[in-house]
């Protein structure tokens, strides 16, 4: 993967997250902000999830209350380099825990 393809895939990921949160109709308040390639999701209780790009490694990093995760593109999915779980699974688990209700991005 070259840098431009990495940025295209990361942009696509950011856009999907932003669209899903714009459509959010749950009880809790969830905000999303993108600044300088860093996407921050803020929950009603003040907790945050931070997602950023690591261009030199062509990775996406996810920081949650539960820990930090690094994802590589494998096939057509972002996969955690430690657990093998998908980005969407780990993001949904963390967002659900931090929101106090089920959050889905798919």
From Swiss-Prot:
GO function term, MF aspect, one: ferrous iron binding
Keyword terms of this UniProt record: Iron, Metal-binding
CDD domains: Frataxin
One family name in Pfam for this protein: Frataxin_Cyay
Annotated GO CC locations: cytosol
GO biological process, one term: iron-sulfur cluster assembly
Entry coiled-coil feature ranges: none
SMART domains for the chain: Frataxin_Cyay (SM01219)
Family: Belongs to the frataxin family.
Function: Involved in iron-sulfur (Fe-S) cluster assembly. May act as a regulator of Fe-S biogenesis.
Protein name (database record): Iron-sulfur cluster assembly protein CyaY
The organism of origin for this protein: Escherichia coli (strain SMS-3-5 / SECEC)
